[in-house]
């Protein structure tokens, strides 16, 4: 059973206001000029965080990456970047960007994110463009790195390059401010718009929730069911080129039985190379026997070619997210059956 993170977070009352965000940022930077680098281009995921951060600083310098953000939301196309002849690791000002690329809008939302983020960044906001995280240090030594999956490496790069203070989104609201919600592990990462002045944070205490839910199923139904919380799936849209995973992880909490990777043989490979001379029931029985006798670790073995094992929680969470959608299906949890069965069962 996979439960969507939103249900858990809402049940926990894990919310924070923009003023809570501003207070935490102000406490960390003391009204200094702050650089905000590598944010994703998303009204749902980042616009309100930007507003809150802007309220807590004296001046904000926002550094955007080209041609897209970390998860594939494009400011411009790859072709436009190539044709421009610029080095994306150099610094491009807002004026230079508009001169080269006009006023591009997001392919799906129709939003001009440069204009939107400039308006949300407050009166004293500047926007630059560079794929080099350390470019921001020419403007300020105090930085919020807003990237998600590369945040630890980015922070290390900035500190080695001379930054005085670097704070990731996971460091903001990792403790309660003014009795706000918080997430000790992920801070603002995984948050969503709730209202115009409030965000819903990623749920906390998630491992315990999964274990408690499993106990409840056992108590009420007498069955041991693996349980997990899921947010964004880890799949990438082949048309829009957007990677769905804007959360810090696919599954922040799960029971012990969901730890690890699949260990499978490739039926097509075995059918062609091992039992190709057999037909009908003989072929079926031979395949079943091969599956039953497979090694516990098939790494680097030909029979596992093309199976590319991924974490079970990433696979199941992606399956759940694709099933539940992101709109009005009304599916707070997903029931998955027979996932751990194979051809031999």
What are the roles of these predicted feature ranges?
Residues 1, 6-345:
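Conserved mixed alpha/beta catalytic, RNA-binding, or beta-rich assembly cores of soluble enzyme
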């Amino acid at each position: 059973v996979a439960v969507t993170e939103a249900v858990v977070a809402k049940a926990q009352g894990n919310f924070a206001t923009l003023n809570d965000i501003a207070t935490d940022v102000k406490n960390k930077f003391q009204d200094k000029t702050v650089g905000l680098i590598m944010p994703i281009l998303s009204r749902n995921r980042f616009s309100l965080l930007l507003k809150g951060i802007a309220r807590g600083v004296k001046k904000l310098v926002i550094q955007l990456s080209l041609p897209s953000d970390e998860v594939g939301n494009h400011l411009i196309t790859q072709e436009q970047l190539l044709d421009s002849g610029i080095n994306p690791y150099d610094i491009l000002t807002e004026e230079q960007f508009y001169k080269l690329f006009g006023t591009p809008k997001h392919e799906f939302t129709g939003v001009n994110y440069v204009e939107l983020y400039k308006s949300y960044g407050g009166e004293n906001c500047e926007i630059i463009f560079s794929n080099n995280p350390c470019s921001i240090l020419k403007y300020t030594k105090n930085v919020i790195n807003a990237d998600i999956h590369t945040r630890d490496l980015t922070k290390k790069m900035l500190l080695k390059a001379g930054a005085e203070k670097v704070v990731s989104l996971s460091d903001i609201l990792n403790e309660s401010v003014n009795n706000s919600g918080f997430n000790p592990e992920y801070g603002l990462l995984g948050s969503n718009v709730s209202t115009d002045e409030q965000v819903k944070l990623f749920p906390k205490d998630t491992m315990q929730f999964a274990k408690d839910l499993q106990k409840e199923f056992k108590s009420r139904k007498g069955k041991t069911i693996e349980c997990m919380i899921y947010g964004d799936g880890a799949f990438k849209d082949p048309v829009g080129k957007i990677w769905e995973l804007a959360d810090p992880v696919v599954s922040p909490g799960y029971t012990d039985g969901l730890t690890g990777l699949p260990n499978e043989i490739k039926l097509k490979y075995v059918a062609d190379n091992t039992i190709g001379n057999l037909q009908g029931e003989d072929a079926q029985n031979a395949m079943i026997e091969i599956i039953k006798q497979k090694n516990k670790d098939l790494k680097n073995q030909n029979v596992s070619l093309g199976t590319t094992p991924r974490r079970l929680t990433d696979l199941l969470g992606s399956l759940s997210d694709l099933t539940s959608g992101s709109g009005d299906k009304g599916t707070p949890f997903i029931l998955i059956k027979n996932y751990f069965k194979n051809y031999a069962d």
